[in-house]
A protein has these predicted regions:
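Extreme N-terminal starter segment of soluble prokaryotic enzymes
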Residues: 5-12
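Active-site catalytic loop in hydrolytic enzyme cores
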Residues: 93-172, 178-187, 240, 244-245
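CN hydrolase (nitrilase-like) catalytic-core segments centered on the catalytic cysteine
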Residues: 70-85, 149-233
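Conserved beta-strand and immediately adjacent loop positions that scaffold enzyme active sites
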Residues: 87, 101, 129, 217-218, ...
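Cys-nucleophile CN-hydrolase/nitrilase-fold catalytic domain and related Cys-dependent amidase chemistry
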Residues: 22-107, 172-198
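Short beta->alpha transition motifs characteristic of CBS
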Residues: 52, 103, 115-118, 219, ...
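Short polar catalytic/cofactor-binding loops
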Residues: 14-20
């Protein structure tokens, strides 16, 4: 008798920027998660630092990290009844140091976090741990944005028999810089997929914010490097894919 393998249904969300308003960001997250509940989504990925917004200003980074100390528990309360695993980015504080982290939330509880190994934001401490997690028979880990420029963090995840690497991104940049990274961001994800033999899924912000722009690089890439799903540039949206356990 042939045994049917279970699949991990993931959703990657491309969003407009929301700055310094955890309640409004929470509204956007809850709206997507309620949809995910109806669609049988196992895991929903949001962009880097989405909860309070990304920045390269050190004072703003530390301020947002301080606010996150209460914003993350508040978000957990709001999503406690939702089945889908939530992965959302925020600057956060630990032992007086600021990290750029992806927070993994299940049933209203923080079950883990990954802190960016190659932070390019001033005053942010590099993470040194590479945890993996199991959902629906698929082991996965997280890298964050600039980590995709480096093979090491992805390999640390793959070496733990992970099948999937999540990449929260935030490509909200000055227009000339955004233009340079428009193709490079996706190329990096393809490189990491081929290098590790893992599925790769990314979630990015999009649109404009002041004098900044992000085209959006929200995509799902096979271990062979084929892009099988992508949200159109400069549009909010979500794409869904079923990742096999092996």
């Amino acid at each position: 008798m042939r045994v049917k393998l279970s699949l991990m249904r993931i959703a990657v969300v491309q969003c407009f920027n929301i700055l310094d308003d955890a309640r409004l960001a929470g509204d956007a997250i809850v709206e997507r998660l309620l949809w995910a509940e109806e669609e049988g989504i196992d895991l929903t990925l949001f962009p880097e630092s989405f909860l309070l917004g990304h920045t390269y200003d050190p004072e703003t980074i530390r301020s947002r990290a301080s606010v996150a100390a209460s914003a993350i528990p508040a978000l957990c309360e709001r999503v406690a009844a939702i089945r889908s695993t939530l992965v959302v980015g925020a600057f956060d504080l630990a032992d007086g140091q600021v990290f750029n982290s992806a927070i993994i939330i299940e049933a209203g509880r923080v079950v883990g976090r990954y802190s960016k190994a190659h932070p390019n934001e001033p005053g942010v401490t590099a993470g040194s741990d590479f945890p993996t997690f199991l959902r629906s028979g698929v082991r996965y880990g997280v890298n964050i944005c600039n980590d995709a420029n480096h093979p090491g963090p992805a390999q640390r995840i793959a070496d733990q028999d992970a099948r999937l690497i999540l990449y929260p991104l935030n490509n909200m940049l000055r227009s000339e810089t955004a233009d340079r990274w428009r193709e490079k961001s996706l190329a990096n994800l393809i490189d990491r997929a081929r290098q590790t033999g893992c599925w790769v899924a990314s979630a990015d912000v999009t649109g404009t914010s002041g004098n900044l722009v992000s085209y959006g690089c929200t995509a799902i890439v096979t271990p062979e490097g084929s892009v099988v799903a992508r949200v159109p540039e400069l549009q909010e949206g979500v794409t869904v894919y079923d990742v096999p356990p092996c």
